[in-house]
Amino acid sequence: MRRLPHLAGRFWRRRAAFWGGALLVGAVSVLFAQAADGAEHLFFHYDSRFWLAPLLVTPLGYAFCAWAAARVFPGSQGSGIPQAIAAREIPRGMARRRLLSVRMCFAKIGLTVVALMCGASVGREGPTVQVGAAIMLQVARLRGLQNERGLILAGSAAGIAAAFNAPLAGVVFAIEEMSRSFEVKTNGIVLTTVIIGGLVSLGLTGNYTYFGTSNAAIQGLGGWGMVVLCGSAGGLLGGLFSRLMMDIGLWAKSWIAVNRRVRGLAYPAMCGLLVAILGILSQGDSFGTGYATAKAAVEGITPHWYFWPAKFLATLITAVSGIPGGIFAPSLSVGAVSYTHLRAHETVLD
């Protein structure tokens, strides 16, 4: 009986550490979002004054970010979701800690912000998954919590919930992307972390909708036909993107391996140059996250016809360049804008 107060105290200390980790995920996600927005605004500010600047800044930025990700912070490349999935699947040990370390959090946030400052077609939502998973893993290590896999899943879901200000999105993401078999003992951990992270995001940024609001409604068989068409087109584009990303990525690895010292810098610099050229040709539309353009499209403003192919190519090139950054926001912008043109075409036919 004397041990009960001690056990109860340990239980509540662990519980407080868990809640504190969830609060930290939400707060860091909001700060990351603000830093990313500021970096993107800075890029568009100097791009509007010196329209040829991306031809120099973007290749140099890509080369620096790829070099730092490969040599200084290995494991920070790409969106961050594959790293979170891998960390959850591998056994406990140094490999898991390396993928989800505090150092990796700073690297992921910092390099993604630098990439956006250089005009990269990346998003912050994917990196937020790795950051959220890393924070919750550190909580598990510091307080001796045993369920590391469950906390990685919870941190990833909370990251998505805070990034999109949508708690339900975090739960769905946890089931669909991170864990095909949702363990019963993990349910409470995930839900609690998502709710706390979402409330922090709500408290710091207010009640906003990620892509704005729309009064559009599906009407008649023609409207449902457009739903089927958009879904099919989105699936085909997504499949094509994934296939090209894997094939080009494999080719790039073999090409760089011939002379890693020279080609390891030349390859991302060439990717950055291509992104810069696409951005200039598209009047700046393909630079950055694409969030503003997608939000405008949802609210009924039809962007230029060349936005979605330019954004598709810029995002693909960026995804295979080896720099840190997500593909969530750019991919969503491609889908949103391509639909607006299908809708406009339907209106013309009517």
Which ranges hold each PLM region?
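Alpha-helical transmembrane segments and immediately membrane-proximal extracytoplasmic
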Residues: 1-343, 349
